[in-house]
Amino acid sequence: AGVLRNLAMNDDNRVAIAAAGGVEVLVSLARDGSEAQKENAVGALANLAVNDDNSVAIAAADGIEVLVALARDGTERQKDCAAGALCNLSMNDDNKAAIVAAGGIDVLVSLARDGIEGQKACAAGALRILAGNDEHRVAIAAAGGIDVLIALARDGTEAQKGEAAGTLRNLAMNHDNSVAIAAAGGIEVLIALARDGTERQKGGAAVALGNMIEVASGTHEGVVEAGGVAVLSSLTQEAGASDLCKLVAAIALVHLACTRADLAAGDTCLSLLLSRLDQPEEGGWRRDSINALLRLATSSSACAEQWHRVGGVAALQALARETA
């Protein structure tokens, strides 16, 4: 199993191992082998699961149930490997449902709270992917995940903070979750990440704040009081920030301006959103830019005037012609 684990780090080998029946053998070892065999088998399955077809095959061989059990009850090394495997497997929609059905959310939240360093990051990563589904967002919150993820975003390693910010971003697409994140002190943590974090952390935090403001308008007061306007405004103009990072901060500011008559999204924000209309869709950001612009145009007369001034009408007319 240890040899297969190493071989499975190569793309061609992943295909060959699966073709030779290796998935079934490794799942069997992960379930019934010695402690060392289980560890190596789970490590091999984690590497194999990078391949989409292998990910499906692992689930078909009942590997998800085995991996959830090891993530819950295994040795520290087994838990580490199992968390990584579940993170890779969760990229598949059917696997997401199977992980949840096997009790994976409770196990992953527990690992994110109590695990060792690598376990926490992998568990938070798996939760981030699972949280792309609204039912799963609700289940993660019900399992106590919000408090756990806020703690990781505040006190974790850089990798843990990045994964936690991404998970909070997805969880915040749900109204009740956004309210819960705010109540648990998440706004302050997210603003701190948007100000001082890595590129990935800043982007995840800015999107999380934007989602909260959009779906739970009552959270905007907390963002303003915690200094979020200055932090997000700075991020839209930060020299070292990526275009995407600037864009998500701009979207958050537009949503904020739509909820507070005394706030206005700067022309820089609107220009960032308008520039996205000329680019191909990627990750939904073009759609989100359009939605934010339309919301701004109808939120107040002052916002509508600004929207006209920076060319919003012409840009959306061009977009309408393109999609007609």
Predicted regions mapped to residue ranges:
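Short loop/turn motifs that cap or connect beta-strands within the blades
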Residues: L29-R31, L70-D73, L111-R113, L152-R154, ...
